[in-house]
A protein has these predicted regions:
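Hydrophobic alpha-helical topogenic segments used for membrane insertion/localization
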Residues: 2-26
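A short loop-to-beta-strand scaffold at the N-terminal edge of the catalytic core in hydrolase folds
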Residues: 46-56
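Conserved HGGG/HGGXW glycine-rich cap/lid loop of the alpha/beta-hydrolase fold
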Residues: 54-100
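Active-site loop/oxyanion-hole signature of alpha/beta-hydrolase fold enzymes
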Residues: 92-132, 308
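Conserved hydrolase catalytic core segment
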Residues: 126-170
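Conserved alpha/beta-hydrolase catalytic His-Asp/Glu region
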Residues: 193-253
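Conserved loop-alpha-helix segment in the C-terminal half of the alpha/beta-hydrolase fold
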Residues: 256-294
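Catalytic active-site module of serine/aspartate enzymes centered on a nucleophile-bearing elbow/loop
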Residues: 284-317
Length: 317
């Protein structure tokens, strides 16, 4: 009996060691190309960690907030920044838990991001700003604006998450998944499987782009690198997202919005028209525009159309 226990413990230790080495190899491979260079920007010392950001151009302030996803970063805006900065002082940031920002071991809640956006605009930008945001990040952007009337001059959203998807709450099963992802070795391994090159390639081809032939290897490498920076600690954000802690209903906030609110949607996206209708039914002042030949991230697939649409909206408001 004791011999069997020793064999089991030995095999368990060998398995754990092998998985740990595999995790470290994945980390090293992801960092090898160093596409996301931190020296190109600055760090905002926030209460929960250092937040990577950039500031470029001159003119009225415009803050770009990438989609809330462990694979995302401000690199999401790489194809539109140079053109937007011709007319605006453009700020980008890597949300906490993403990209080059710190990825602390904590529960990432929707309100955490409300606080981050509020503090960054007040302490670093220092004046009312227009905000261009993407997908899941619509929730905390709208809530931050609703809670602080002097924060934003206008909001533009690329393919906002559906109101129904934001109304999901956590449960026991989701909490178990959160705990699994937070485990030191096996949790990192599970996370690495979820953000593998194969998984990212599938996401880009099926969800992110309408025309897969436009996907560049450098773009894929940047997303892969973002997911694995800081020893794959993006798993803590993923753990909280799996448990729906980053979700929050925004219907009440959408109804009360007093700043110009503009939805930019992809015709090739799933349920784009129906999604827009749920927003406009709550607030008739919301404006919408549809872009063709793109899916989830038009800022990457049709950047010129996005820049033209954003500039036109900001000039009119």
């Amino acid at each position: 009996m004791k011999k069997n226990i020793r064999h089991f413990l030995l095999l368990s230790a060998l398995a754990a060691g092998s998985i740990h080495l595999l995790n470290r190899f994945i980390q090293a491979a992801a960092d090898m190309k160093n596409i996301l260079k931190a020296e190109n920007g600055n760090y905002y010392d926030w209460k929960n960690g250092k937040i990577y950001y950039t500031k470029r151009g001159n003119g009225s302030p415009l803050l770009l907030i990438h989609d809330l996803d462990p694979v995302s970063s401000s690199y999401e805006w790489c194809k539109v920044i140079r053109k937007l900065e011709k007319n605006h002082t453009v700020y980008t940031l890597d949300l906490i838990g993403c990209g080059r920002s710190d990825k602390p071991f904590l529960t990432y809640t929707n309100y955490l991001y409300v606080q981050l956006i509020t503090d960054f605009i007040r302490n670093d930008i220092g004046e009312k700003t227009a905000v261009l945001t993407s997908n899941e990040s619509v929730s905390f952007t709208v809530l931050a604006c609703n809670m602080n009337k002097d924060l934003m001059s206008s909001i533009l959203v690329l393919n906002p998450a559906s109101l129904k998807s934001l109304h999901i709450t956590t449960n026991k099963y989701a909490s178990v998944k959160k705990t699994l992802f937070e485990l030191p070795i096996i949790g990192t391994f599970l996370y690495n499987l979820r953000v593998s090159n194969t998984s990212l390639n599938k996401a880009f081809r099926e969800d992110y782009y309408a025309r897969p032939q436009l996907i560049s290897s450098k773009l894929m490498d940047a997303y892969y690198e973002a997911a694995h920076m800081n020893f794959s600690r993006g798993k803590y954000l993923m753990a909280s997202m799996e448990a729906n802690y980053t979700k929050n209903s925004i219907e009440h906030a959408v109804k009360k919005l007093e700043v110009p609110f503009y939805l930019i949607l992809s015709r090739n996206g799933k349920d784009a028209i129906a999604n827009a209708d749920t927003y406009t039914r709550l607030n008739s002042s919301i404006e919408t525009v549809y872009l063709s030949n793109c899916k989830k991230y038009p800022q990457l697939e049709v950047p010129d159309k996005v820049v033209e649409t954003v500039n036109q909206f900001l000039q009119n408001n």
